[in-house]
C-alpha cells in the first residue's frame, strides 16, 4: 500500500506540474530615455503625503499627475538590509531637496514597497522616520512592470506634458558614489 501511495503521489505531482501555466517573462529593466510605464498607484490616504505629491481625492493616480518636474522613485523592501541601512541617507536627501528653494517642489520622492503590504510599509515608514510617501506593492505588480530590479533601486522620472520619461536608473551604490548623497540634490536635477 505504501508503494502505491508513493506512485500515486508522484503521478499527481507530475500531472500538477504540467498543468501549471508558465507565467509571462519578466519585464526588462527600464532604460534611460524610454517612456515610464503607464502604471497606476493608490493615492495616499495621508493628507500631507497627498498634498506633497500635488494630488487630490482618492482612488489611484498616474506618475504624470504628480506636481513636479521630476520624481525619484525608490524601490525598497522592508526586509532589505541595504534599504534599512540607507533609509537615513535617503531621508537626508529628501530634507536637502525640501530646504533648497530652487529644488523644492521641482523634485519629489516616492517609495514603492516591493512585496510589502500596507502594514509592512507603515512599519518601515515609522521605524526609519521616512518623511516622503511610501506605497505598498504587495503583489509585486508594479515591481514587475518596472523590471523586477533588486532593492534598493532608484528611477528618476522626468515628468513633462507628454508623459514621464526615465531620466536615470541606479542602485544605492551609484547614488552614493555619484556624490548625490547626502546633501547634494542639485546633481539629481542635472541627470
Question: Over which residues does each language-model region extend?
Answer:
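Bacterial N-terminal signal peptides that target proteins for export
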Residues: 1-11
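Conserved redox-active cysteine motifs that mediate thiol-disulfide chemistry
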Residues: 75-92
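Thiol/disulfide oxidoreductase modules built on the thioredoxin-like
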Residues: 126-130, 138-191
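Bacterial N-terminal signal peptides
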Residues: 9-20
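Conserved segment of the thioredoxin-like fold in thiol-based oxidoreductases
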Residues: 99-138
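Short pre-active-site segment immediately N-terminal to redox-active cysteine/selenocysteine motifs
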Residues: 69-71, 76-79, 150
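Boundary at the C-terminal end of the N-terminal hydrophobic targeting segment
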Residues: 23-27
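A short beta-strand-turn-helix
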Residues: 41-71
Amino acid at each position: 500500500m505504501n508503494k502505491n501511495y508513493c506512485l500515486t503521489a508522484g503521478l499527481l505531482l507530475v500531472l500538477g506540474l504540467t498543468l501549471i501555466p508558465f507565467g509571462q517573462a519578466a519585464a526588462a529593466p527600464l532604460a534611460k530615455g524610454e517612456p515610464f510605464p503607464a502604471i497606476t498607484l493608490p493615492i495616499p490616504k495621508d493628507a500631507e503625503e497627498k498634498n506633497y505629491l500635488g494630488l487630490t481625492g482618492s482612488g489611484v493616480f498616474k506618475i504624470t499627475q504628480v506636481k513636479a518636474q521630476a520624481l525619484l522613485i525608490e524601490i525598497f523592501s522592508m526586509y532589505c538590509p541595504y534599504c534599512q541601512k540607507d533609509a537615513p541617507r535617503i531621508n537626508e536627501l529628501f530634507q536637502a531637496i525640501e530646504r533648497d528653494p530652487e529644488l523644492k517642489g521641482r523634485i519629489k520622492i516616492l517609495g514603492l514597497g516591493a512585496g510589502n503590504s500596507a502594514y509592512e510599509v507603515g512599519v518601515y515608514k515609522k521605524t526609519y522616520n521616512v518623511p516622503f510617501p511610501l506605497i505598498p506593492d504587495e503583489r509585486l505588480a508594479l515591481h514587475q512592470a518596472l523590471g523586477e530590479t533588486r532593492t534598493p533601486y532608484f528611477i528618476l522620472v522626468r515628468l513633462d506634458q507628454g508623459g514621464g520619461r526615465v531620466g536615470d536608473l541606479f542602485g544605492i551604490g551609484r547614488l552614493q558614489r555619484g556624490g548625490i548623497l547626502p546633501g547634494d540634490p542639485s546633481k539629481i536635477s542635472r541627470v
